[in-house]
Amino acid sequence: MKSLLLLVLISVCWADHLSNNYTLDHDRVIHIQAENGPRLLVEAEQAKVFSHRGGNVTLPCKFFRDPTAFGSGTHKIRIKWTKLTSDYLKEVDVFVSMGYHKKTYGGYHGRVFLKGGSDNDASLVITDLTLEDYGRYKCEVIEGLEDDTAVVALDLEGVVFPYFPRLGRYNLNFHEAQQACLDQDAVIASFDQLYDAWRGGLDWCNAGWLSDGSVQYPITKPREPCGGQNTVPGVRNYGFWDKDKSRYDVFCFTSNFNGRFYYLIHPTKLTYDEAVQACLNDGAQIAKVGQIFAAWKLLGYDRCDAGWLADGSVRYPISRPRRRCRPNEAAVRFVGFPDKKHKLYGVYCFRAYN
Protein backbone atom coordinates (compact mmCIF):
# COMPACT_ATOMS: atom_id res chain seq x y z
CA MET A 1 0.00 0.00 0.00
CA LYS A 2 2.85 2.36 0.89
CA SER A 3 4.57 1.52 -2.41
CA LEU A 4 1.44 2.34 -4.38
CA LEU A 5 0.99 5.67 -2.56
CA LEU A 6 4.63 6.60 -3.22
CA LEU A 7 4.20 5.83 -6.97
CA VAL A 8 1.12 8.06 -7.18
CA LEU A 9 2.92 10.96 -5.45
CA ILE A 10 5.91 10.66 -7.82
CA SER A 11 3.60 10.68 -10.86
CA VAL A 12 1.76 13.81 -9.65
CA CYS A 13 5.03 15.62 -8.97
CA TRP A 14 6.40 14.70 -12.43
CA ALA A 15 3.21 15.97 -14.08
CA ASP A 16 3.47 19.29 -12.19
CA HIS A 17 7.10 19.58 -13.26
CA LEU A 18 6.13 19.10 -16.94
CA SER A 19 3.27 21.60 -16.72
CA ASN A 20 5.60 24.28 -15.35
CA ASN A 21 8.16 23.81 -18.14
CA TYR A 22 6.03 22.98 -21.21
CA THR A 23 2.89 24.94 -22.04
CA LEU A 24 0.66 24.17 -25.05
CA ASP A 25 0.46 27.38 -27.06
CA HIS A 26 -2.06 27.86 -29.89
CA ASP A 27 0.66 27.33 -32.52
CA ARG A 28 1.97 24.14 -30.96
CA VAL A 29 0.36 20.84 -32.02
CA ILE A 30 1.28 17.37 -30.85
CA HIS A 31 0.75 14.65 -33.51
CA ILE A 32 0.35 11.09 -32.35
CA GLN A 33 1.22 8.68 -35.20
CA ALA A 34 -0.52 5.33 -35.02
CA GLU A 35 2.12 2.63 -35.07
CA ASN A 36 0.36 0.65 -37.80
CA GLY A 37 -0.77 3.61 -39.89
CA PRO A 38 0.64 3.91 -43.44
CA ARG A 39 3.18 6.72 -43.64
CA LEU A 40 4.06 5.95 -47.26
CA LEU A 41 1.59 4.61 -49.80
CA VAL A 42 2.44 3.40 -53.32
CA GLU A 43 -0.30 2.90 -55.91
CA ALA A 44 -0.58 1.91 -59.57
CA GLU A 45 -3.46 3.61 -61.38
CA GLN A 46 -3.73 0.62 -63.72
CA ALA A 47 -3.04 -2.99 -62.83
CA LYS A 48 -2.26 -3.82 -66.49
CA VAL A 49 -1.03 -1.84 -69.49
CA PHE A 50 -0.94 -2.91 -73.14
CA SER A 51 1.51 -2.29 -75.97
CA HIS A 52 3.36 -4.16 -78.71
CA ARG A 53 6.90 -5.03 -79.73
CA GLY A 54 8.78 -1.94 -80.85
CA GLY A 55 6.38 0.41 -79.07
CA ASN A 56 6.74 2.54 -75.94
CA VAL A 57 4.80 2.17 -72.70
CA THR A 58 4.45 3.85 -69.32
CA LEU A 59 4.13 1.67 -66.22
CA PRO A 60 2.08 3.83 -63.81
CA CYS A 61 3.20 4.30 -60.21
CA LYS A 62 2.65 7.12 -57.71
CA PHE A 63 3.53 7.48 -54.05
CA PHE A 64 1.89 9.46 -51.27
CA ARG A 65 3.59 10.51 -48.02
CA ASP A 66 2.04 11.54 -44.72
CA PRO A 67 3.54 15.02 -44.22
CA THR A 68 2.69 14.90 -40.51
CA ALA A 69 4.63 11.68 -39.90
CA PHE A 70 7.81 11.98 -37.85
CA GLY A 71 10.84 12.30 -40.13
CA SER A 72 8.78 12.78 -43.31
CA GLY A 73 10.71 14.71 -45.94
CA THR A 74 14.08 14.36 -44.22
CA HIS A 75 15.20 11.36 -46.28
CA LYS A 76 15.86 11.06 -49.99
CA ILE A 77 13.27 9.11 -51.94
CA ARG A 78 14.59 5.89 -53.48
CA ILE A 79 12.60 4.43 -56.40
CA LYS A 80 13.34 0.91 -57.55
CA TRP A 81 11.75 -1.03 -60.41
CA THR A 82 12.19 -4.79 -60.74
CA LYS A 83 10.67 -7.45 -62.97
CA LEU A 84 9.13 -10.52 -61.36
CA THR A 85 9.98 -13.89 -62.88
CA SER A 86 7.08 -16.04 -64.06
CA ASP A 87 7.36 -18.25 -60.97
CA TYR A 88 7.64 -15.19 -58.64
CA LEU A 89 10.74 -16.71 -57.05
CA LYS A 90 13.18 -14.02 -58.22
CA GLU A 91 13.27 -10.35 -59.12
CA VAL A 92 15.33 -8.91 -61.97
CA ASP A 93 16.65 -5.37 -61.46
CA VAL A 94 15.41 -2.87 -64.04
CA PHE A 95 15.95 0.68 -62.78
CA VAL A 96 16.95 2.50 -59.57
CA SER A 97 16.75 6.22 -58.84
CA MET A 98 17.71 8.26 -55.77
CA GLY A 99 18.04 11.99 -56.21
CA TYR A 100 20.34 12.69 -59.13
CA HIS A 101 21.70 9.13 -59.12
CA LYS A 102 20.09 6.77 -61.62
CA LYS A 103 21.03 3.30 -62.84
CA THR A 104 19.59 0.91 -65.41
CA TYR A 105 20.31 -2.81 -65.68
CA GLY A 106 20.86 -5.41 -68.38
CA GLY A 107 18.84 -5.20 -71.56
CA TYR A 108 16.93 -2.18 -70.21
CA HIS A 109 20.01 0.05 -70.50
CA GLY A 110 19.17 3.13 -72.55
CA ARG A 111 15.49 2.17 -72.83
CA VAL A 112 14.00 3.12 -69.45
CA PHE A 113 13.55 6.36 -67.50
CA LEU A 114 11.19 7.90 -64.96
CA LYS A 115 8.27 9.83 -66.40
CA GLY A 116 8.63 12.53 -63.75
CA GLY A 117 5.21 14.08 -64.30
CA SER A 118 5.09 15.33 -60.71
CA ASP A 119 7.04 15.17 -57.45
CA ASN A 120 5.23 11.99 -56.43
CA ASP A 121 5.35 10.30 -59.85
CA ALA A 122 7.44 7.10 -59.95
CA SER A 123 6.06 5.89 -63.30
CA LEU A 124 8.56 4.10 -65.55
CA VAL A 125 8.76 4.61 -69.31
CA ILE A 126 10.07 1.68 -71.38
CA THR A 127 10.92 2.36 -75.03
CA ASP A 128 11.49 0.04 -78.00
CA LEU A 129 9.69 -2.86 -76.31
CA THR A 130 10.95 -6.40 -76.86
CA LEU A 131 9.17 -9.72 -76.48
CA GLU A 132 11.14 -10.33 -73.29
CA ASP A 133 9.71 -7.17 -71.69
CA TYR A 134 6.34 -8.88 -71.24
CA GLY A 135 5.53 -9.66 -67.60
CA ARG A 136 4.91 -8.17 -64.16
CA TYR A 137 6.91 -5.28 -62.75
CA LYS A 138 7.22 -4.10 -59.15
CA CYS A 139 7.49 -0.43 -58.23
CA GLU A 140 9.09 0.07 -54.81
CA VAL A 141 9.42 3.46 -53.10
CA ILE A 142 11.63 3.81 -50.02
CA GLU A 143 11.94 6.79 -47.65
CA GLY A 144 14.10 6.12 -44.63
CA LEU A 145 12.63 3.10 -42.85
CA GLU A 146 9.33 3.36 -44.71
CA ASP A 147 8.62 1.56 -47.97
CA ASP A 148 5.69 0.32 -50.04
CA THR A 149 5.22 -1.44 -53.38
CA ALA A 150 2.80 -1.81 -56.28
CA VAL A 151 2.76 -4.31 -59.16
CA VAL A 152 1.94 -3.55 -62.80
CA ALA A 153 1.51 -6.13 -65.57
CA LEU A 154 2.79 -5.34 -69.07
CA ASP A 155 0.87 -7.20 -71.77
CA LEU A 156 1.86 -7.28 -75.44
CA GLU A 157 -0.37 -7.59 -78.46
CA GLY A 158 0.60 -10.76 -80.27
CA VAL A 159 -0.12 -14.36 -81.13
CA VAL A 160 0.55 -17.73 -79.48
CA PHE A 161 1.41 -20.67 -81.72
CA PRO A 162 2.32 -24.31 -81.05
CA TYR A 163 5.68 -25.46 -82.33
CA PHE A 164 7.65 -28.67 -82.79
CA PRO A 165 10.84 -29.21 -84.84
CA ARG A 166 11.64 -31.41 -87.82
CA LEU A 167 12.36 -34.32 -85.45
CA GLY A 168 8.65 -34.51 -84.68
CA ARG A 169 6.37 -34.05 -81.72
CA TYR A 170 7.50 -34.35 -78.09
CA ASN A 171 11.19 -33.87 -78.82
CA LEU A 172 12.09 -30.74 -76.83
CA ASN A 173 13.24 -30.41 -73.26
CA PHE A 174 12.52 -27.05 -71.61
CA HIS A 175 15.81 -25.41 -72.60
CA GLU A 176 15.55 -26.61 -76.19
CA ALA A 177 11.97 -25.33 -76.25
CA GLN A 178 13.13 -21.87 -75.21
CA GLN A 179 15.74 -21.84 -77.98
CA ALA A 180 13.29 -23.17 -80.56
CA CYS A 181 10.99 -20.20 -79.94
CA LEU A 182 13.90 -17.73 -80.12
CA ASP A 183 14.99 -19.26 -83.43
CA GLN A 184 11.51 -18.53 -84.83
CA ASP A 185 11.44 -14.84 -83.78
CA ALA A 186 9.40 -15.60 -80.66
CA VAL A 187 9.68 -16.38 -76.95
CA ILE A 188 8.21 -19.22 -74.94
CA ALA A 189 4.64 -18.27 -73.99
CA SER A 190 3.35 -17.67 -70.47
CA PHE A 191 0.27 -19.34 -69.03
CA ASP A 192 -1.65 -16.06 -69.24
CA GLN A 193 -0.81 -15.76 -72.94
CA LEU A 194 -1.89 -19.34 -73.62
CA TYR A 195 -5.08 -18.80 -71.63
CA ASP A 196 -5.92 -15.66 -73.63
CA ALA A 197 -5.23 -17.58 -76.86
CA TRP A 198 -7.56 -20.37 -75.70
CA ARG A 199 -10.28 -17.82 -75.00
CA GLY A 200 -9.66 -16.55 -78.52
CA GLY A 201 -10.29 -20.03 -79.96
CA LEU A 202 -6.90 -21.79 -79.94
CA ASP A 203 -7.42 -25.57 -79.89
CA TRP A 204 -4.37 -27.85 -79.86
CA CYS A 205 -4.20 -31.45 -78.73
CA ASN A 206 -0.46 -31.69 -78.03
CA ALA A 207 1.06 -30.65 -74.72
CA GLY A 208 3.73 -27.98 -74.75
CA TRP A 209 6.13 -26.19 -72.42
CA LEU A 210 5.26 -22.78 -70.97
CA SER A 211 7.61 -20.17 -69.51
CA ASP A 212 6.97 -21.20 -65.90
CA GLY A 213 8.13 -24.76 -66.62
CA SER A 214 4.64 -26.25 -66.70
CA VAL A 215 3.28 -28.39 -69.55
CA GLN A 216 -0.24 -27.60 -70.79
CA TYR A 217 -2.48 -27.53 -73.86
CA PRO A 218 -5.68 -25.66 -74.86
CA ILE A 219 -8.90 -27.45 -75.84
CA THR A 220 -11.97 -25.60 -77.12
CA LYS A 221 -13.62 -28.68 -78.70
CA PRO A 222 -13.39 -31.65 -76.28
CA ARG A 223 -12.94 -35.00 -78.05
CA GLU A 224 -11.72 -38.50 -77.23
CA PRO A 225 -8.02 -38.14 -78.15
CA CYS A 226 -7.84 -34.83 -76.25
CA GLY A 227 -8.85 -35.48 -72.67
CA GLY A 228 -12.20 -37.12 -73.43
CA GLN A 229 -15.35 -36.15 -75.29
CA ASN A 230 -17.37 -35.52 -72.13
CA THR A 231 -14.89 -33.13 -70.53
CA VAL A 232 -15.31 -29.36 -70.44
CA PRO A 233 -13.25 -27.00 -72.63
CA GLY A 234 -10.22 -25.49 -70.96
CA VAL A 235 -6.45 -25.39 -70.69
CA ARG A 236 -5.33 -28.89 -69.67
CA ASN A 237 -2.46 -28.93 -67.19
CA TYR A 238 0.10 -31.76 -67.11
CA GLY A 239 1.91 -30.07 -64.21
CA PHE A 240 5.64 -29.40 -63.81
CA TRP A 241 8.19 -31.78 -65.30
CA ASP A 242 11.95 -32.24 -65.34
CA LYS A 243 13.30 -29.41 -67.51
CA ASP A 244 16.28 -31.47 -68.66
CA LYS A 245 14.80 -34.93 -69.24
CA SER A 246 11.12 -34.46 -70.06
CA ARG A 247 10.24 -33.81 -73.70
CA TYR A 248 7.23 -32.06 -75.15
CA ASP A 249 6.31 -29.49 -77.79
CA VAL A 250 6.30 -25.78 -76.93
CA PHE A 251 3.92 -22.84 -77.14
CA CYS A 252 5.63 -19.72 -78.48
CA PHE A 253 4.57 -16.08 -78.44
CA THR A 254 5.43 -13.34 -80.93
CA SER A 255 4.28 -9.80 -81.63
CA ASN A 256 4.46 -7.07 -84.28
CA PHE A 257 7.58 -6.92 -86.41
CA ASN A 258 9.39 -4.00 -88.00
CA GLY A 259 9.61 -5.16 -91.58
CA ARG A 260 7.81 -6.65 -94.56
CA PHE A 261 6.60 -10.24 -94.76
CA TYR A 262 5.74 -11.45 -98.26
CA TYR A 263 5.44 -14.39 -100.63
CA LEU A 264 8.15 -14.14 -103.26
CA ILE A 265 6.89 -14.24 -106.81
CA HIS A 266 9.25 -16.59 -108.63
CA PRO A 267 8.99 -18.24 -112.06
CA THR A 268 9.60 -21.76 -110.71
CA LYS A 269 9.12 -23.83 -107.59
CA LEU A 270 12.16 -24.07 -105.33
CA THR A 271 14.17 -26.46 -103.22
CA TYR A 272 14.92 -25.28 -99.69
CA ASP A 273 18.42 -24.05 -100.58
CA GLU A 274 17.08 -22.27 -103.66
CA ALA A 275 14.39 -20.64 -101.51
CA VAL A 276 16.98 -19.28 -99.07
CA GLN A 277 19.03 -17.86 -101.93
CA ALA A 278 16.00 -16.40 -103.70
CA CYS A 279 15.12 -14.32 -100.63
CA LEU A 280 18.74 -13.16 -100.31
CA ASN A 281 18.74 -12.14 -103.97
CA ASP A 282 15.64 -10.06 -103.24
CA GLY A 283 17.36 -8.20 -100.39
CA ALA A 284 15.58 -10.20 -97.70
CA GLN A 285 15.85 -13.40 -95.67
CA ILE A 286 13.73 -16.51 -95.64
CA ALA A 287 10.92 -15.88 -93.13
CA LYS A 288 10.57 -17.55 -89.74
CA VAL A 289 7.56 -19.33 -88.29
CA GLY A 290 6.88 -16.52 -85.81
CA GLN A 291 6.78 -14.01 -88.66
CA ILE A 292 4.18 -15.92 -90.68
CA PHE A 293 1.97 -16.21 -87.57
CA ALA A 294 2.36 -12.50 -86.76
CA ALA A 295 1.56 -11.50 -90.36
CA TRP A 296 -1.50 -13.76 -90.37
CA LYS A 297 -2.89 -12.82 -86.95
CA LEU A 298 -1.95 -9.15 -86.65
CA LEU A 299 -1.96 -8.02 -90.30
CA GLY A 300 -4.57 -10.35 -91.77
CA TYR A 301 -2.08 -11.73 -94.31
CA ASP A 302 -3.72 -14.26 -96.63
CA ARG A 303 -2.04 -16.40 -99.27
CA CYS A 304 -3.08 -19.78 -100.63
CA ASP A 305 0.44 -20.77 -101.73
CA ALA A 306 2.55 -23.16 -99.68
CA GLY A 307 6.05 -21.82 -99.08
CA TRP A 308 9.30 -22.72 -97.39
CA LEU A 309 10.20 -21.17 -94.03
CA ALA A 310 13.55 -20.91 -92.25
CA ASP A 311 13.10 -24.03 -90.11
CA GLY A 312 12.53 -26.19 -93.19
CA SER A 313 8.78 -26.40 -92.74
CA VAL A 314 6.23 -25.53 -95.41
CA ARG A 315 3.17 -23.49 -94.44
CA TYR A 316 0.70 -20.91 -95.74
CA PRO A 317 -1.53 -18.33 -93.98
CA ILE A 318 -5.29 -18.19 -94.56
CA SER A 319 -7.24 -15.26 -93.11
CA ARG A 320 -10.25 -15.69 -95.42
CA PRO A 321 -11.26 -19.38 -95.46
CA ARG A 322 -12.46 -20.55 -98.87
CA ARG A 323 -12.62 -23.63 -101.03
CA ARG A 324 -9.21 -25.31 -101.41
CA CYS A 325 -7.74 -22.86 -98.89
CA ARG A 326 -8.59 -24.13 -95.41
CA PRO A 327 -12.36 -23.84 -95.94
CA ASN A 328 -13.33 -24.41 -92.29
CA GLU A 329 -11.30 -21.86 -90.35
CA ALA A 330 -8.70 -19.12 -90.56
CA ALA A 331 -5.29 -20.54 -89.67
CA VAL A 332 -1.67 -20.94 -90.67
CA ARG A 333 -1.82 -24.23 -92.49
CA PHE A 334 1.02 -26.66 -91.83
CA VAL A 335 2.05 -28.82 -94.79
CA GLY A 336 4.95 -30.53 -93.05
CA PHE A 337 8.74 -30.85 -93.11
CA PRO A 338 9.32 -32.19 -96.63
CA ASP A 339 12.63 -33.30 -98.10
CA LYS A 340 14.61 -30.09 -98.61
CA LYS A 341 15.57 -31.25 -102.10
CA HIS A 342 11.96 -31.35 -103.27
CA LYS A 343 11.32 -28.64 -105.83
CA LEU A 344 7.62 -28.30 -105.03
CA TYR A 345 7.09 -25.05 -103.13
CA GLY A 346 7.53 -21.30 -103.18
CA VAL A 347 9.05 -19.26 -100.35
CA TYR A 348 8.03 -16.65 -97.81
CA CYS A 349 10.57 -13.87 -97.24
CA PHE A 350 11.07 -11.17 -94.62
CA ARG A 351 12.79 -7.84 -95.18
CA ALA A 352 13.56 -5.90 -91.99
CA TYR A 353 13.24 -2.12 -91.96
CA ASN A 354 16.31 -0.21 -90.79
UniProtKB/Swiss-Prot annotation:
Stored Pfam families: V-set, Xlink
Positions bearing carbohydrate: 21, 56
Keywords of the record: Disulfide bond, Extracellular matrix, Glycoprotein, Hyaluronic acid, Immunoglobulin domain, Repeat, Secreted
Domain called Link: residue spans: 159-254, 259-351
Propeptide stretches in the record: 1-9
Alphabetized PANTHER family for the sequence: AGGRECAN/VERSICAN PROTEOGLYCAN, HYALURONAN AND PROTEOGLYCAN LINK PROTEIN 1
Record protein name field: Hyaluronan and proteoglycan link protein 1
Native source species: Sus scrofa (Pig)
